[in-house]
Amino acid sequence: MGSMLLASFPGASSITTGGSCLRSKQYAKNYDASSYVTTSWYKKRKIQKEHCAAIFSKHNLKQHYKVNEGGSTSNTSKECEKKYVVNAISEQSFEYEPQTRDPESIWDSVNDALDIFYKFCRPYAMFTIVLGATFKSLVAVEKLSDLSLAFFIGWLQVVVAVICIHIFGVGLNQLCDIEIDKINKPDLPLASGKLSFRNVVIITASSLILGLGFAWIVDSWPLFWTVFISCMVASAYNVDLPLLRWKKYPVLTAINFIADVAVTRSLGFFLHMQTCVFKRPTTFPRPLIFCTAIVSIYAIVIALFKDIPDMEGDEKFGIQSLSLRLGPKRVFWICVSLLEMTYGVTILVGATSPILWSKIITVLGHAVLASVLWYHAKSVDLTSNVVLHSFYMFIWKLHTAEYFLIPLFR
């Protein structure tokens, strides 16, 4: 009988039996006839079982069960007395302690995520690109009355499109160059492990879908084709497939930058404002031609100069940049000379402007840029990657300043 009752009690781990019972048949008969297990005993037993189960599942208890079975049998009473003692020792408190998250820790997590995304987007380039899109849109402005609500809505559409293009480009570049960036740019989120490969794929694909979808929704074919062509050119530059990976070849690199930044975006953003916002016929005014020409030179310079600080990683992975072929010093002075010649030509062209204020601003503005560039170039240490990278950032600043002058050329 003791073994039967113990088998029906699953929580017991060690049982000590004290006393004796009749053999199974006689005991079963007497048990059916006179049982001392009352209804209250069953309830108590059920509560004990549920309590033990809760302890096991929620509090990781170390449980010790001690079951003392004692009883006596006689011919007259034929009784069995049982006593069950359950001792549970918990390593944790039974009281529920709610875990509250510190608002400061939540804010720190959000701030860290935004900082990682900020670095992922390469803000120095994004700022210049957004500013460039703004001033390329201003090229379509012919009179002050054009600066209306419709213009600002069209400008916002251009900004959304160019941000999507930029995020797709930097995301694809980091995905395709992750091993190179571990050498050249180890602080980038993907190369440093702060962003996972999967997350960067999601961000990159989402930016492409959002850019194309947005251009489709606003019903602007110039904007749609600008997003599409820019993303395809970025793919040709980065993706390592046959006939692609143009970044391996200096000439194709320059063509890539000119086709994307100078031609596609300049024409696309201008035509979006001209035909979709102002509802005017397609034209190619003098400021647009000037914008395309000067931005093309900047695109070539940036394409060539960006490889100077990255020579170590490029050489290891077989990218034959112009810096590796000619040496960093020659490429450095080629870039500086290209910009100086561009400023000189721009000064001459600006002097022919029929509008006095445009003539003065164009000539003086580019004379200042040429002087500042030459002053900084003479003090650059060509053996220091840190200094070269700093000068590369300086070229981006010159590029940004140029965008302020482009809309004023008439």
Swiss-Prot record:
Residues 1-23 form a transit peptide. Keywords: Chloroplast, Membrane, Plastid, Transferase, Transit peptide, Transmembrane, Transmembrane helix. The chain crosses the membrane at residues 124-144, 150-170, 195-217, 222-239, 251-271, 288-308, 331-351, 355-375, 386-406. Optimum temperature is 75 degrees Celsius. Its cofactor is Mg(2+); Mn(2+). This is Naringenin 8-dimethylallyltransferase 1, chloroplastic. Its EC number is 2.5.1.70. Secifically expressed in root bark. Not detected in aerial tissues. It comes from the Eukaryota. InterPro entries: AtHST-like, UbiA_prenyltransferase, UbiA_sf. One of its GO terms (molecular function) is prenyltransferase activity. Pfam families: UbiA. Its main location: plastid. Involved in the biosynthesis of sophoraflavanone G (SFG). Can use flavanones (naringenin, liquiritigenin and hesperetin) as substrates, but not flavonols or isoflavones. Shows a strict specificity for dimethylallyl diphosphate. It is found in: Plastid, Chloroplast membrane. PANTHER family: HOMOGENTISATE PHYTYLTRANSFERASE 1, CHLOROPLASTIC (PTHR43009:SF6), HOMOGENTISATE SOLANESYLTRANSFERASE, CHLOROPLASTIC (PTHR43009). Induction: Up-regulated by elicitor, methyl jasmonate and salicylic acid. It comes from Sophora flavescens. It is a multi-pass membrane protein. GO terms for cellular component: chloroplast; chloroplast membrane. It catalyses: (2S)-naringenin + dimethylallyl diphosphate = sophoraflavanone B + diphosphate. Belongs to the UbiA prenyltransferase family.
